[in-house]
Amino acid sequence: MNTHIQIDGQGEDTIVMLHGWPDTGALWARQVADLQADYRCVRLTLPGFATDEQSRALSMDEVVAWLDESIRFVSDRPVILMAHDWGAVFAYAYVRAHPERVARLIGLDIGDTSETFTRRLPLKHKLMMLGYQLPLAVSYRLPRRWATPLTRRIARVLRAPAAPESIHAGMNFPYFQAWFGGKARYQSSTEFIPSCPMLFVYGTRKPFQFFAPEWAQKIAALPNSQVTAMRAGHWMMVDAPDEFNRIVREWLARTPDAD
C-alpha cells in the first residue's frame, strides 16, 4: 500500500490528519497553515486516493494496519489524531485497536456508526444515504471511464470542496466495502467510546447527522472531552476554517493528554 505523507511544522506534539471521501491530504491546508507554528502537522492520504492506484478494496484490518504503520513512522510518541468522514470511521477503529498510540482524538462530523445507530436511523435518512452511497459502491467495480465521471457528479451534488480533477472512482472503495464486503464489511457491533480525551465537531447545515444524540451526550460527559456544533456543512474545516481552527486550538490548549 502506498503511503502519502506530508509533514509541516516543528511542534512538540504531532497532529495526524486523516481525510475522507473524496479528499486527499490537501483538505487540511487551512488547518496546517494555522497550526504548524505550534504543532507538527502530518497529513496522510488514504491508500488509493492520491491517484487511482488501488486495485482492491481494503478491509478494516488492513486500513488499521496501514494507519498504525504510518503513525509509527512519523512519531514514536502518542499522537493527536484528527479525522473526518471515512477518516473518522478508520480513526475510531484504530483507537479501538491501539489506544496507547492516541493521546487525544478529534472526530469530525461522523460519530459512532455501529449497528445500533444504523438500526435507529429513520427510513427517510436511510434512503438519502442509499441514494448516493450505493451508486458510489457499485461504481467502484465499473470501468473507470464511466465510474469516475459519475463519482465527480455525485461529489458536485454533495458540494465536496475537492478539485474535480483530483476525484476518481478508486476513492469509492470504502463504500464498496461497506455495502458489499461480506464478512469484512465496515460494521461494528459495539458503540465507540474512546479512552482518551475527544473533541467532536459537526456541521448543522445538513439534512441529517451521522451520529445519535445519545452518543454525543456520552462523549461530552467524558473527562476533558467536548462536543461542538458549527453552522457549517459536512466540510466545516473548509466552510468556516477560522472558526474551526479556533475551536481546535482552544480545546488542545486546555486539554491534557490521556494518562
Predicted regions and their residues:
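A short loop-to-beta-strand scaffold at the N-terminal edge of the catalytic core in hydrolase folds
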Residues: M1-I7
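Generic structural signal for small/hydrophobic residues in well-ordered secondary structure
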Residues: I5, H19-G20, W28, L35, ...
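Conserved HGGG/HGGXW glycine-rich cap/lid loop of the alpha/beta-hydrolase fold
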Residues: I7-T51
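Glycine-rich phosphate-binding loop signature in dinucleotide/nucleotide-binding domains
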Residues: G9-Q10, I71-R77, W251, T255
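Residue-level signal for the nucleotide or nucleotide-sugar donor/cofactor binding architecture
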Residues: D23, L58, E62, D239
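Hydrophobic residues on the short alpha-helix immediately C-terminal to a glycine-rich phosphate/catalytic loop
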Residues: Q31, Y94, I247-W251
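Flexible "cap/lid" subdomain of the alpha/beta-hydrolase fold that forms the substrate-access gate
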Residues: V42, F49-S75, V79-M82, W86-A229
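Catalytic histidine-centered segment of alpha/beta-hydrolase-like enzymes
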Residues: A232-P241, N245
